[in-house]
Amino acid sequence: MERDNGTIQAPGLPPTTCVYREDFKRLLLPPVYSVVLVVGLPLNVCVIAQICASRRTLTRSAVYTLNLALADLLYACSLPLLIYNYARGDHWPFGDLACRLVRFLFYANLHGSILFLTCISFQRYLGICHPLAPWHKRGGRRAAWVVCGVVWLVVTAQCLPTAVFAATGIQRNRTVCYDLSPPILSTRYLPYGMALTVIGFLLPFTALLACYCRMARRLCRQDGPAGPVAQERRSKAARMAVVVAAVFVISFLPFHITKTAYLAVRSTPGVSCPVLETFAAAYKGTRPFASANSVLDPILFYFTQQKFRRQPHDLLQKLTAKWQRQRV
């Protein structure tokens, strides 16, 4: 083996077939994933429990939020395997099937969250910009459940190839779980990876920005309804827009920018291992931002839903009062 600026390159292989020295992953990913697991798992369970407890009065946005929390919960359940893997220095002992499943769950959560947040934003857009139009109110919750079913089918179709490309391999005498694909399949993965970014992120992000631009113009107009109820409605819509945009910018945008750059460089012939390793480190360094979406989503829910935000406070007051009565 031949060392090249900290990157190991096997002799006789193409210059872009490198084995990276990624010690930063052991320091960065286990703590971040542990926080996401410890914080995100109970938060999403609470969101699901609260929405299910109010199932008779569910709005369309609540139905979308419930499915968003389910996607986050499924991903959080896969994190213990990744925490163990990176804490052991990128050693994967769980087999090829578990590797494919974990990679699929990551991208299914990522693109499911993007689409469900887009659905929530579009529902808010309809309520603000077309409040009296009857066509978007037909079907009620049943229509929302149909939309969620379509979203899950689309996400599964989008992300199923990740389970095909992801695989285990041997590097430095240990088994690793490739995130995107083995290096030998990098050229074949490129069209799919780029299409997934465009269809699974860029198009929903563009639609979301268009909705929020229309909403901002409508909210800034002075000829709308007046009064405290209308003002509260506008404030709630503004909060939703700011928080959802923040989730996209923090969680999704850096990850997709660095992933796209890495895919392009990885598939370019003649790229040296140090350059390739730099792009790989940038891409893998933004993975925690994408994972943080499982924590940010339930915070978004509580920040924008006043009714559900009051429930934990009321429950805490009841428990405190009961505890004080027992002490007397």
From Swiss-Prot:
Positions in the Cytoplasmic compartment: 49-62, 123-144, 216-236, 304-328
Q: Which PROSITE patterns match?
A: G_PROTEIN_RECEP_F1_2
Task: Tell me how this protein sits in the membrane.
Answer: Multi-pass membrane protein
Might you report a single GO cellular component term?
A: basolateral plasma membrane
Indicate which residues are glycosylated according to the record. N5, N173
Keyword Translocase applies: no
UniProt GO MF annotations: G protein-coupled ADP receptor activity; G protein-coupled UDP receptor activity; G protein-coupled UTP receptor activity
Cysteine-cysteine disulfides: C99-C177
Question: What are the entry keywords?
Answer: Cell membrane, Disulfide bond, G-protein coupled receptor, Glycoprotein, Membrane, Receptor, Transducer, Transmembrane, Transmembrane helix
Question: What InterPro entries is this protein classified in?
Answer: GPCR_Rhodpsn (IPR000276), GPCR_Rhodpsn_7TM (IPR017452), P2Y6_rcpt (IPR001973)
User: What Pfam families is this protein classified in?
Assistant: 7tm_1
Q: List membrane-spanning regions.
A: 28-48, 63-83, 102-122, 145-165, 195-215, 237-257, 281-303
Q: Extracellular side of the membrane: what ranges?
A: 1-27, 84-101, 166-194, 258-280
Q: Where in the cell is it found?
A: Cell membrane
- Name the organs or tissues of expression: Abundantly expressed in various tissues including lung, stomach, intestine, spleen, mesentery, heart, and, most prominently, aorta.
Q: Name one GO biological process term.
A: positive regulation of smooth muscle cell migration
Q: Which family does it belong to?
A: Belongs to the G-protein coupled receptor 1 family.
Entry-linked PANTHER family: P2Y PURINOCEPTOR 6, PURINOCEPTOR-RELATED G-PROTEIN COUPLED RECEPTOR
Q: What does this protein do?
A: Receptor for extracellular UTP > ADP = 2-methylthio-ATP > ADP-beta-S > ATP = ATP-gamma-S. The activity of this receptor is mediated by G proteins which activate a phosphatidylinositol-calcium second messenger system. Functionally coupled to phospholipase C.
What this protein is called in its record is P2Y purinoceptor 6
Task: Give the gene name.
Answer: P2ry6
